Regions:
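Surface-exposed, low-hydrophobicity beta-strand/loop segments enriched in small/polar/acidic residues
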Residues: 1-165
Length: 165
């Protein structure tokens, strides 16, 4: 059965000024100071993100990862390891202005039509990908390394597309 959405979702966040982790080598250390709200489902029936993209705004942007967090924290000041988990990650390694990087998302329980009986494709290939955001949850994004090149004001944009239930 397909996921039915009430209205489309198109949201963006600007990242790069602060790191979203307290430890650069541990995804289980979210820092509210570097997390930026991307999607808010705290007061609706939830949603699904079917596409996440990173846009590098400047040539030779600092190499960094954009980390996507699913959280029940309604403000960045209340983000902690108890209420926030990393669910996706994508890299910024731009040498070209405007370069887009799509963040890989996990398979959903939504089948792709006409692939059910095909034994030549994997079980994962038979499902659409996306990120289900339950009612009461929020999606935050941030970078693991502050974007300092080519300038101290360098930022990247993260776009989410999908729908709200």
């Amino acid at each position: 059965m397909p996921l039915l959405v009430d209205r489309p979702m198109h949201s963006f966040a600007t990242v790069g000024g602060a790191t979203c982790l307290t430890s650069a080598t541990n995804l289980n250390t979210p820092s509210g100071g570097g997390c930026i709200l991307l999607v808010d489902c705290s007061a609706n029936d939830g949603g699904v993100i079917d596409s996440l993209s990173i846009i590098a705004n400047e040539a030779t942007t600092t190499a960094s990862n954009v980390i996507v967090f699913l959280s029940t924290a309604t403000t960045t000041s209340t983000i902690s390891t108890a209420n926030t988990v990393a669910v996706a990650i994508g890299g910024i390694g731009s040498t070209n202005m405007g370069e887009r990087t799509n963040i890989a998302l996990p398979p959903l329980s939504v089948p792709v039509p006409n692939l059910g009986g095909d034994t030549t494709v994997s079980e994962t290939d038979k499902k659409n990908t996306g990120l289900y955001v339950p009612s009461g949850a929020l999606v935050y994004v941030g970078v693991d390394v502050v974007l300092t090149a080519p300038s101290a004001t360098t930022v990247a944009h993260v776009f989410a597309q999908g729908g709200f239930f």
